[in-house]
């Protein structure tokens, strides 16, 4: 497993920002208290498809799933695949739990907390797909080490994906865009940018739904959105 070093700017070993916003509604709190413990990954030990879902199935992992729209869409689209989502913001977790309950999805596991702590316990080469969509940009240079797209996490992504597996990244922040591309250029030995034309990165790929955050970025703030697919060599 990855060793996290205190103060090392190439790794992440703590969460930043809020963990809860407005108070949860009564039923949301009920889901957090009752459904979440049933579908959370184990607190210790390896995180495998067999342990989570009782069988060896393709395994997906989403880091920071927000309100869960993408995670739920993908899980519904691929019912024979297993999905793990990690989100530190409790309101987002509650929103995702509501969708899981409503759609009766049995192939999702949810972690309310640090994604890298769980990802670190996934066996190397076990993931089919890994998603990082609209992470917190931390736009100030002094906060750059807080960005999820840094050498330490990207090295972990490469370790956990199987050969031919896919890492999907999306952002609407130009500072994060430049930073992410700079980081990925240092990992071309592990990842190949999947692109077929010059405008691919401006067009949402098939099977990649628009989330509430992305819709807000476009319609309220007028942001462009960029989409990237990287294949594990």
UniProtKB/Swiss-Prot annotation:
One Pfam family, short name: Methyltransf_4
Residues annotated as binding substrate: 140, 172, 211-214
Catalytic-site annotation from UniProt: 136
Keywords: Methyltransferase, S-adenosyl-L-methionine, Transferase, tRNA processing
Gene3D superfamilies in the cross-refs: Vaccinia Virus protein VP39 (3.40.50.150)
E.C. designation(s): 2.1.1.33
Catalysed conversion reaction: guanosine(46) in tRNA + S-adenosyl-L-methionine = N(7)-methylguanosine(46) in tRNA + S-adenosyl-L-homocysteine
Keyword Chloroplast: no
Pathway: tRNA modification; N(7)-methylguanine-tRNA biosynthesis
One of the record's GO cellular component terms: tRNA methyltransferase complex
UniProt binding sites for S-adenosyl-L-methionine: 62, 87, 114, 136
An MF annotation (GO) of this entry: tRNA (guanine(46)-N7)-methyltransferase activity
Domain of life: Bacteria
PROSITE patterns referenced in this protein's UniProt entry, alphabetically: SAM_MT_TRMB
Similarity annotation: Belongs to the class I-like SAM-binding methyltransferase superfamily. TrmB family.
Functional summary from the UniProt entry: Catalyzes the formation of N(7)-methylguanine at position 46 (m7G46) in tRNA.
Family annotation (HAMAP family): tRNA_methyltr_TrmB
The name this protein goes by in its record: tRNA (guanine-N(7)-)-methyltransferase
The gene coding this protein: trmB
């Amino acid at each position: 497993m990855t060793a996290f070093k205190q103060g090392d700017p190439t790794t992440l070993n703590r969460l930043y920002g809020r963990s809860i916003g407005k108070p949860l509604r009564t039923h949301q709190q009920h889901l957090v208290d009752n459904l979440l413990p049933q579908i959370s990954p184990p607190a210790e030990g390896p995180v495998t498809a067999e342990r989570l879902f009782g069988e060896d199935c393709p395994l997906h992992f989403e880091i920071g799933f927000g309100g869960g729209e993408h995670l739920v869409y993908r899980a519904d689209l691929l019912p024979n695949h297993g999905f793990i989502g990690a989100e530190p913001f409790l309101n987002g977790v509650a929103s995702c739990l509501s969708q899981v309950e409503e759609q009766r999805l049995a192939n999702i596991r949810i972690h309310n907390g640090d994604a890298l702590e769980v990802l670190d316990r996934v066996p190397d080469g076990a993931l089919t797909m890994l998603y990082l969509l609209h992470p917190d940009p931390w736009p100030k240079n002094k906060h750059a080490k807080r960005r999820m797209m840094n050498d330490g996490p990207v090295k972990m992504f490469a370790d956990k994906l199987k050969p031919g597996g896919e890492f999907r990244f999306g952002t609407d922040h130009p500072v994060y865009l430049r930073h992410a591309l700079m980081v990925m250029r240092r990992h071309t030995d592990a990842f190949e940018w999947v692109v077929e034309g010059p405008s691919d990165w401006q067009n949402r790929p098939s099977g990649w739904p628009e989330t509430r955050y992305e819709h807000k970025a476009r319609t309220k703030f007028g942001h462009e959105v960029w989409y990237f697919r990287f294949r594990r060599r």
